[in-house]
């Protein structure tokens, strides 16, 4: 049993020990059982939290709101237009005000420095719902999903395909190193995690008996994978010229049947969502009209296959976020 996490911020997994991460995963599994059996668990009744969103979201917002309500807390949501942080009021002042009114603060937005500063000034636990650099709550959901499917995670190999510079790849590399999971970043050689973070993770991985591998070779990168993971290539609001460049660069790293067949028998597919695997989204249709692509980072065949565990993974956001809030607020 690790030392108490009460009062701690949850900003990045580098701040947590292997034992602390394992504790959060065990707690999440317990909360999932309570939810599935309909057992009330309003353990934090009387507390209030605020969700500070500078970037919109479906899964993160819903996970925090449902988890907060399940725990008996009041939940306030501030959308990108509802907060004066950084506009009429400094980040420090906003953090101090919110910290006087709420028992915990979730932030989803841009630079990691913003959430770190919130954590420095608020005086209450601050949770990172996503920044440009890291996405720690997603990682707990990912590993819980892997644990549920295989029965264990230590010694497995996870391959991330695509732009490995992003927050998801960064966070996957960290959590894999912490938990003894071999991590492979498979993508263009100029789209790899920063050298400093790679060096840090390799040191942690060595202590936990696993490896960090960077490769541009799809066959080598996916050969021994138990888990194939990817993320979207483009985002709404980015210029079309950037879309074309990124699609051309990342197309060789699409997750398709050939990739899954090259992985280990029984390999699973994970994706943090949303995904552009068909034409049922505005961006998907726009990409099709401009570039003739019906599928992007993953084919519809793989996305809908029995190997795909993306909806288990999405549900697990709620259970793992509940664990983080309970552990830091109890």
What is each model feature region?
Residues 48-101:
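Active-site cofactor/substrate anionic-group-binding motifs, chiefly glycine-
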Residues 96, 103-175, 271:
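Anion-binding alpha/beta catalytic cores of soluble intermediary-metabolism enzymes, centered on
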Residues 2, 286-330:
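C-terminal helix-to-coil terminal segments
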């Amino acid at each position: 049993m690790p030392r108490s996490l009460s009062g701690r911020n949850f900003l990045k997994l580098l701040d947590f020990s292997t034992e602390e991460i394992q504790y959060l995963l065990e707690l999440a599994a317990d909360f999932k059982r309570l939810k599935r059996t309909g057992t009330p668990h309003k353990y934090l009744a009387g507390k209030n939290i605020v969700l500070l969103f500078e970037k919109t979201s479906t899964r993160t917002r819903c996970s925090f709101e449902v988890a907060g309500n399940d725990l008996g807390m009041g939940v306030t949501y501030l959308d990108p237009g509802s907060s004066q942080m950084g506009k009429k009021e400094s980040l420090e002042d906003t953090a101090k005000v919110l910290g006087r009114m709420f028992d915990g603060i979730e932030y989803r937005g841009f630079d990691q420095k913003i959430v770190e500063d919130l954590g420095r000034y608020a005086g209450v636990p601050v949770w990172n719902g996503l920044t440009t650099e890291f996405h720690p709550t997603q990682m707990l959901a990912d590993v819980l999903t892997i644990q549920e499917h295989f029965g264990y995670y230590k010694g497995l190999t996870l391959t991330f395909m695509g732009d490995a510079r992003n927050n998801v790849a960064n966070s996957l590399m960290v959590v894999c190193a912490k938990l003894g999971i071999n991590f492979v970043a498979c993508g263009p050689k100029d789209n790899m995690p920063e050298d400093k973070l790679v060096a840090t993770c390799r040191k942690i991985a060595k202590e936990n008996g696993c490896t960090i591998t960077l490769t541009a070779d799809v066959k080598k990168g996916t050969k021994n994978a138990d888990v194939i993971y990817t993320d979207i290539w483009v985002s709404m609001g980015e210029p079309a010229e950037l879309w074309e460049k990124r699609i051309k660069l990342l197309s060789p790293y699409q997750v398709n049947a050939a990739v899954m067949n090259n992985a280990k028998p029984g390999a699973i597919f994970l994706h943090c969502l949303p995904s552009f695997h068909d034409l049922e989204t505005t961006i998907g249709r726009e990409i099709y009209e401009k570039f003739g692509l019906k599928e992007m980072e993953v084919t519809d065949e793989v996305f809908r296959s029995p190997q795909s565990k993306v909806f288990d993974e999405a549900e697990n956001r709620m259970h793992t976020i509940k664990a983080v809030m309970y552990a830091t607020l109890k």
